A protein has these predicted regions:
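Conserved PLP-binding catalytic core of the aspartate aminotransferase-like
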Residues: 62-129, 179-180
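Active-site C-terminal subdomain of aminotransferase-like
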Residues: 1-82
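PLP-dependent enzyme catalytic core of the Aspartate aminotransferase-like
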Residues: 112-181
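Low-acidity, Ser/Thr- and Arg-rich intrinsically disordered low-complexity segments
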Residues: 184, 192, 199, 203-207
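Generic non-transmembrane alpha-helical segments
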Residues: 51, 55-59, 88-96, 145
């Protein structure tokens, strides 16, 4: 009787109908996570984050916890005289081609809509194949933007550097636009047919994580 009560509480009480496309996506993700390459990728994410954090600190940028042991870090802008400038810095970095998120920091008395921190991580750049030396370069670009966030010419200079950097580390090495078009057409056709499980259209594509 107890088992029946638990089962009925879980379904339909707490769970709805299964989504086959989500189940398939999870299966693919779990399969990828079992591979040695994923372990190496995860280690590189942390190594990259530590390299970026160390470089930011050496450039006078304050980090909450004074470093990182995982995939992300939180910049405290207050020691740089930029209390409540998180949103402005986020937008400036975005103009320069660097994606971060405005974020509150401990004991931040600024509004969460205009906080005093920036959160950034390394999984995306690691997926492109970048390593520690590239993290140092990115950290240097971030520091330039933080100190010159109102200078449009500086932002454009950094953007040019970032564009040059990412062009050397394409998401799918060797894949041209013309080669990608048939895959895109297949996905569009599947969507137009109302087929939700389209993830396998990309099964032959592997980001550069090694």
């Amino acid at each position: 009787n107890l088992a029946q009560l638990i089962d009925s509480a879980v379904f339909p009480g707490l769970q709805g109908g299964p989504h086959d496309n989500v189940i398939a996506a999870k299966a693919v993700a779990f399969k990828e996570a079992m591979k040695p390459e994923f372990k190496d990728y995860s280690k590189q994410i942390v190594n990259n984050a530590k390299a970026m954090a160390d470089e930011l600190i050496s450039l006078g940028i304050k980090l909450v916890t004074n470093g990182t042991d995982n995939h992300l870090m939180l910049i405290d802008l207050r020691p740089s005289g930029l209390r409540g400038k998180g949103k402005q810095l986020q937008n400036a970095l975005d103009k320069a081609g660097i994606t971060v998120n405005k974020n509150s920091v401990p004991y931040d008395d600024a509004s969460p809509f205009n906080p005093s921190g920036l959160r950034l991580g390394t999984p995306a750049v690691t997926s492109r194949g970048m390593k520690e030396s590239e993290m140092q370069h990115i950290a240097q670009c971030i520091a330039v933007v933080i100190h010159n966030y109102r200078d449009e010419s500086k932002l454009q200079e950094v953007k040019a550097e970032i564009n040059e950097l990412v062009s050397a580390y394409p998401i799918y090495p060797g894949l041209t636009v013309l080669e990608f078009l048939p895959i895109l057409m297949k996905v569009i056709n599947l969507i137009s047919l109302g087929i939700p499980n389209i993830s396998f259209a990309f099964s032959s594509l592997k980001p550069a994580i090694g």
